Structure formats: C-alpha cells, structure tokens
Amino acid sequence: MRCAPPGLLLAQLHACIFWSGLWPAGCQSPPAAWRQRIQWENNGQVYSLLSQGAQYQPPRRRQGAEPASSPVLLLRGNGSVPRAAAAAAARPQPEPQPQAQPQPRPRSSRRQPLGRRHWFQAGYRAPSGSARPAPRRRPRGRRSRRRERAERRRAAAPSGLRPGREDVMVGDDPYSPYKYTDDNPYYNYYDTYERPRQGSRYRPGYGTGYFQYGLPDLVPDPYYIQASTYVQRMSMYNLRCAAEENCLASSAYRADVRDYDNRVLLRFPQRVKNQGTSDFLPSRPRYSWEWHSCHQHYHSMDEFSHYDLLDASSHRKVAEGHKASFCLEDTSCDYGYYRRYACTAHTQGLSPGCYDTYNADIDCQWIDITDVKPGNYILKVSVNPSYLVPESDYSNNIVRCDIRYTGHHAYASGCTISPY
C-alpha cells in the first residue's frame, strides 16, 4: 500500500480547515461563488486553494432590481425585532412628555404589505413617490425645558481640570515656528521654561484673567546685563532702521555721514520682571500705537527704558542716552505662571511672574559710544523712567554697572539695583 506524500496531506488538511471556517454553523444559504484562486508548486506537484474573499463594490444608487451579489442590508417590518432594537427596548425609557392629539391621517387606497423591505445602501436614495412627510415636532413640556436648563448649567460649571483659556495671547504662539520675526532668529528668542501641562490645575488667581488686584512692579535683572555686555562695530548701511528710531548719537545724522562709515556700539541685554500683583499695561491707548515697518511690530509706549553712559568720577553724561520704546510681551514666565501677552497689534503687556527679555543683538539695545574715549564709566539702565505707568515700588527700576572701556573692548562689573 502506497502512502500519499506528506505535502499533499498537509495541503488537504489546510483546505479542510479553510472550508470549515468559511461555512458558518446554521447557515442555510449556499456559500458565495469562488472568486480567488491561489496556486503553488512543491516537489513537482501543483497545489491550489480557492477563496471566497470579499470583492470591493463602489457605492451606487439602487435602480430597479439589484443583483443577488450586491451587499445590501435588509430590515424587515413584520414584527421581528433585531438585537440592537431589543437592547434599546430593554433600557429604561424617559417619562412620557405631554403631546398634542394626533391628527387623523387620510387612508390610502393602496395598502402596503406588512413585510415590506427597507433598503440601506451607500448612495441609495428613496424614490420620490415613497417619500414620507416629515414628522411633526412635539410640543415640549415644562419638564423638558427644566431638564435642558439643568444640562446647560452643568456644562457651563467649571470643572476641576483646566478649562479652555480664552484670555491667552491673541495672534501669537511662542512655540509656533511660523511666527514672523523679521527673519532674525535671535529677535526676542523665547527661552520659556516649559509648556503648561494639560492635566494640571490653575494656580489660584493666575492665568485666569487680567490682573487688577494691585499694582505692577518692574525690576530689571542686573546680572543679565553684566554677563553679556560687549562692543560691536557696524556700518551705517546696517543701521538704517535704528537711525529712523533715533537710536544713534547726534554725530550719526550729519550730512557728511556715508553708508560705509562705522559706528561703535556698546551692546547689552535687558530682562525686566513684573514681580507685582497686577498687569503692566502700556501707557498709550491701543489706537495710538505706532507701527514700525523696519521691525514689523507696534510700539505701545513712548519710553519703556532709558540708557545712559555716565563718567565714573563726575557722573556726567558722556554718551547721549536714548529712549527705547519696544513692544511689551511675556517672553518667559516663572514656574506656575502662563504667558498671556504678545508683541502684536491686539494685546501687549507684562503679566505678574513673567519676564520681558531683550537680547543684546536686537536693534536699539545699545548705546552709541563712537565719540567716547577709553576710560571708566557707569552704565545706567532705567525702566519706566518717566513713571508713566503706576507701580507699587519705583526704587528698584534702575540698574548701575561699572564699565571699563579700552577702545576695543568693554568690561562690565558690579551691576546692582540702585534707587537713583
């Protein structure tokens, strides 16, 4: 007696298992037609498998008789309840609402059979003759109105999680790479400490509205100035925007000054913190903000900072100070505080616990020392110098630094907060 090769037995076993899986238990209709056939060869013998794999049929409108192979869902109206309907019927029903008396419908001479079929298929529309009138809306009772009001109050009630904040910065996202910065990657670089976590709660009173529970208090950072003070030489061609804003010494505006003449600039950064309990808002109303096309932003204050270079012995001004009227924004904030103001046309300001940072390499963040001789000097940086915005404390608005200028380099030391 010759036994069948093991490969043939294995193929027959696979075919039996595949057939048993395709034939559902208790199914009375014959299986669908064979659509796919897989063949392979092993040791010179050819094996094949037939499949009833599904065939994609695009959605179409049903017209006339549908072929038997079309995937159509049939729902019978002869009293049979499907599983989903039975489960819905088992749920507790809401108490009945008062409704108006139903209007008697005119009887149709044509009677529809009890076991009519409803066809549901993608792209199928009911014929115009079988269109039923829209059901009438039942008048709602007082209980339904009360239930709707209660649901509205429940949805509007504040939850424990942080809700969507509507008082955030308008038109600005510090994490957006598409924010326009005049093609300068160092202009107001955002050194934000971290993103607010989505699941955390608000710190009480902070980040939930505009602060008007006291007064702001601006404090410049003396160590920030001392760490990054340096001297730079630039041509007048690259200082055209700064010249428009009067950020240079008077000798730069003479008629004999050419574009390739160089200016010597004492550059330094500035970081101002609002450690008060109220927002520091611009002194000018929004409609009077000035648009600067060179820097592509609005200036909301006439004078936010003032820079002076004084002689170390006589305290006399040796370099003409200028007014720095930047735009105000929350560049970064301490942990637990959130940025709410941006350098835009809609909203500018400085929130409590946040910093307004100006790097040393942006326009007008300098003193023009082209006409200054080498020696020892004092750098004086004042914020809110004219006291245009009320503060809780004006004695911490000035920083003084000792500057040693060699003619090529500048060294800053001893930067402290001073009352004068």
From Swiss-Prot:
GO MF terms here are: collagen binding; copper ion binding; protein-lysine 6-oxidase activity
- Where do the segments described as Lysyl-oxidase like lie? 216-420
- Cofactors per UniProt? Cu cation; lysine tyrosylquinone residue
Residues bearing Sulfotyrosine are: Y190
Q: Name one GO biological process term.
A: peptidyl-lysine oxidation
**Entry's EC annotation:** 1.4.3.13
> Per the record, where are the segments of Basic residues compositional bias?
107-119, 134-147
Where are the annotated segments for Disordered?
A: 54-177
Q: Which domain of life is it from?
A: Eukaryota
Q: Where in the cell is it found?
A: Secreted, Extracellular space
The catalytic activity, as recorded, is:
L-lysyl-[protein] + O2 + H2O = (S)-2-amino-6-oxohexanoyl-[protein] + H2O2 + NH4(+)
* Keywords carried by this UniProt record: Copper, Disulfide bond, Glycoprotein, LTQ, Metal-binding, Oxidoreductase, Secreted, Signal, Sulfation, TPQ
Skewed-composition ranges (Pro residues): 93-105
- Cross-link Lysine tyrosylquinone (Lys-Tyr): residue positions: K323-Y358
Q: Which residues cross the membrane?
A: none
**Site positions for Cleavage:** D221, P222
General function of this protein: Responsible for the post-translational oxidative deamination of peptidyl lysine residues in precursors to fibrous collagen and elastin.
Task: Report the family membership.
Answer: Belongs to the lysyl oxidase family.
PANTHER family (alphabetical): LYSYL OXIDASE-LIKE-RELATED (PTHR45817), PROTEIN-LYSINE 6-OXIDASE (PTHR45817:SF6)
Q: What is this protein called?
A: Protein-lysine 6-oxidase
- Species per Swiss-Prot/TrEMBL record: Gallus gallus (Chicken)
